[in-house]
Amino acid sequence: MRRRTLLASGSALGAAAMAGAWMFGETRGGGPAPVVPAAPAGAERVEQRASAARGRVVDFYTAVPDGHGDGRGLPVCLILHGGSKRPPDFPALGLGRFLTDAVRRGAPPFVLAGATGDRLNWRPNGADDPQRMVHDELPAWCDARGFDAGRLAVWGWSMGGYGALLLAETFPGFVRSVAAFSPAVAPGDAVFGGVQRLTGTPIGLWCGRDDGLYDNVKALHRALPAEPAAGGYRAGRHNFGYWSTEVAAAFDFTAAMLADPGSGSRGPAAGAQ
């Protein structure tokens, strides 16, 4: 696990400024281009699933590290995307290649799985409930593929980082760990309001120092019930040029949290309805 770097913070940004940063920052220019490892992707699939929680058909992405066949029996890292990306974009982001690279560097193998969330958040919105999709349906879809849905972690960036933290707060014990890149949080929001419910859940927290959300993320860091188990802060903006430099550390952290088959508190079909 990469040693975390914890730096000093300034004051928190206002909620309005935060919203503009995370809605548009993923495609904002500046900074280096994303760096993707040379390792080959294993089996990557984008399929369609009918989501009762969302009331629509969604894209369902899965990735297995190269050399691990169909991934049967492997634990799962759930992916919560940000506002400008969707599951069909994940192969082009190199997520399957990052996964193989992590395993080739010695990380215990796991699979990635994600589905289409709402463009602006991962919270219930009337009859459209992407959070319930992640909690109730996504593990069942993974279980049907033969993955070990009793061992789950979650990783998200920007809006998806917010959603990953909120998921862990709403359903304590559902995931073994949370990895959040530049989560779109602000003091006083639902994540800050439920932060004590993260007690006992290892958190990895990363953010670029040039990100408009940096002060908010540092405020969240201070509010957490325990120090982050992984993460850090260095030069970088709210885009994949920065995030791509932290995926390796996040996957190493996630793999370590998922590695023990006997420590999970959730059965393979728990939460599925």
Model-derived features: positions:
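Non-catalytic cap/lid and distal C-terminal segments of serine-dependent acyl enzymes
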Residues: 5-273
